[in-house]
Regions:
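Active-site and adjacent substrate-binding regions of carbohydrate-active enzymes
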Residues: 1-227
Length: 227
C-alpha cells in the first residue's frame, strides 16, 4: 500500500520550528555572498511571480500570467496585475520574463494564431519593461510543440513566410529599440474611456528615455472601440 501524505504531514507551527527560514530566501542570500555575479531565474507558480521577486529576491521570474491572460483575453485581470506592481514597486516590472509559449505549452502560433492577435501580443511583449523571450520556432511560425526531452524536430516544417515577414516588418524594428522600453522611470499605464466607461480590453502605455518617447496601443479583443 502507498501511504497517504496526511500520515506524514505536520502543522504549520511544526514546520516553521524545523525550518524557520524560507529555503529560497536563504539560497538567494547565500548566492549573493558567495557568487555575486550569478543570475537567479525562477519559474514560479502562476500568479506568484511578484512574490518570487519581492519577497524571495529572485533577479528574474518567468511571467506566465502574460501568456495565459492575454491568450484568454482576461485583459482587465492583466491590467490589474500591472497596476498592482506599479503601486508596490515599478522596478519589479523589469524582472518579469514575458513570453508567449514555452516547452510545456502549445506553440505561440497554436495559442494566438498568426494574425493581428498574435502580432499585437508580440508587440506588447517587445514594448513592456522586463525581458521579452521568443520561443523556439516562434519567428518561423512552427506549430510543433518542442518538449525539453526533444533531441530534434519530429515534424518536417518549413518557415511560414507570412509570419516571418510580419516579424521582420513589425517586431524586429521594435526590438532594435528595446532601450526605449526596458526601463520603468518613464513608464505610464493609461485607461481608455469610451464614453460609457473604461474599456479594459485596450492596453495603452507610454515609455521612453531621454527625449525619446513611444506610445503603445493594443485592443486585445475582436471588437471595435474608440475613446
Amino acid at each position: 500500500a502507498i501511504p497517504s501524505r496526511s500520515d506524514y504531514s505536520m502543522t504549520d507551527e511544526e514546520f516553521d520550528k524545523l525550518i524557520p527560514v524560507e529555503f529560497w530566501r536563504e539560497v538567494v542570500d547565500t548566492v549573493a555572498q558567495r557568487a555575486p555575479d550569478t543570475l537567479l531565474l525562477a519559474e514560479a507558480f502562476w500568479m506568484m511571480e511578484g512574490y518570487f521577486v519581492r519577497t524571495l529576491g529572485m533577479h528574474r521570474v518567468y511571467n506566465s500570467a502574460f501568456m495565459n491572460m492575454l491568450k484568454r483575453e482576461e485583459n482587465a485581470k492583466y491590467r490589474e496585475t500591472i497596476t498592482n506592481v506599479l503601486d508596490f514597486d515599478p522596478q519589479i516590472l523589469k524582472r518579469f520574463v514575458n513570453f508567449m509559449n514555452n516547452p510545456d505549452e502549445d506553440t505561440a502560433i497554436a495559442q494566438f494564431g498568426e494574425g493581428d492577435k498574435y502580432f499585437g501580443t508580440c508587440a506588447m511583449m517587445a514594448t513592456l519593461p522586463g525581458l521579452p523571450m521568443l520561443g523556439h520556432g516562434q519567428i518561423e511560425g512552427f506549430r510543433e510543440k518542442y518538449g525539453m526531452e526533444y533531441a530534434k524536430a519530429k515534424f518536417d516544417e518549413i518557415p511560414n513566410g507570412h509570419v516571418v515577414y510580419r516579424h521582420e516588418q513589425e517586431i524586429f524594428p521594435i526590438l532594435h529599440h528595446r532601450w526605449m522600453f526596458s526601463e520603468v522611470e518613464s513608464f505610464a499605464l493609461y485607461t481608455l474611456h469610451n464614453g460609457y466607461g473604461f474599456d479594459e480590453d485596450v492596453f495603452a502605455y507610454s515609455n521612453g528615455i531621454g527625449s525619446e518617447r513611444a506610445l503603445f496601443l493594443f485592443n486585445n479583443r475582436d471588437k471595435h472601440t474608440r475613446g
